[in-house]
Amino acid sequence: MVAVVLAVSGMLFTSCVKEGDETIVIPLPDGKIPYSVISESLQDSLLANGFTINEGINPPNIEGVYLAAPLDLHYASDGYSNKFYDLTMTLTGQKMRGMITYSEMQRNTVLGSSIEAQVIGHDSCFTMYCYQYISENSGATQLWKCKIVTVVSGISTDDGFRNCQYSYIMLDREAINDYYLSQLAAYETFRIYYDGDRLAEKIR
C-alpha cells in the first residue's frame, strides 16, 4: 500500500449543484483558480515545480473516463518518494460555467469524489480543480481518510489527456494508526505526478 496516499478522505461526497444554481464551496471561475481554493503562494510553488495551470474561460469538454498509467511522481514538497498506483478519473455533467463532477479510484479500494469541481482553460488546454474526500477501506475497516484539493491539467484529445499532470494539496487527514498516518502527506504539502507515457487514455 502506501503509495496510494494522495491524501484524501472517507465519506464520498458528490456535488449536487444544478445548472443555474450558485456554487456552494468554490467561487465561480473567472478563468483562474481562485486564491481561496489554492493560495497564490501555493500556485506559484506548483508552477515553479513543473505543474501547468491552463487559464481561460473557454475550456474544452473533458467528460469521460480516463486511465492515468503509469503515474510517476515528479515532485513532492514533503519529500515523499514512494510508488503511486494507476489512477482512473471519471468526469461527468460538465456545465457551461465550467462546473463538473469528478471522482477517482485506485486499486478498487481507494475512492474519492469531489465536493465541487470546476474546469478552466482555452482551446484544447484545460485545468480541472476541486475539493475532494478520499478514503481507503479494508473490508468494513476504514484505514485512512483525507480532504484535499485535486488539480488535473492536460490537453484534451480524442485519445485522452495528453501531457496529463495530476497534483493534490493536503487539507486534512486521519488514519487508523500511526503507520497509515505516516504515509499521508502533511498539511498544505503537495505532490505532482505526470502520466508516464504522457497520455491519460480515454477508456469510456
Language model features: what each stretch is:
Residues 17-80, 192-204:
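Amphipathic/hydrophobic helical signal segments and adjacent flexible N-terminal regions
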Residues 143-204:
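Glycine-rich, aromatic-bearing surface loops/beta-hairpins
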